[in-house]
Amino acid sequence: MNTQHDEAFHAILEAKYARIINEISEMYSVSLEEAMDIFYNSPLLPLLEEGVADLHCRSDKYLAEEIWREQVE
């Protein structure tokens, strides 16, 4: 990948992360800070960053639900 493509991909991912965090906060009535902690400590985050199974293509709501489910198990 070229640098310009990398920067664009990371900007898109960062926006997606913000939406997922917001979804977690709204769906499960936790503060944004708690939602951020849950998100950034999720085992799913490295998979999203690496593009495993095109997880970044899944809906924000789906990913929020999966991250929450992992956290409560």
Where are these regions (language model features)?
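C-terminal alpha-helical interaction appendages
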Residues: 1-73
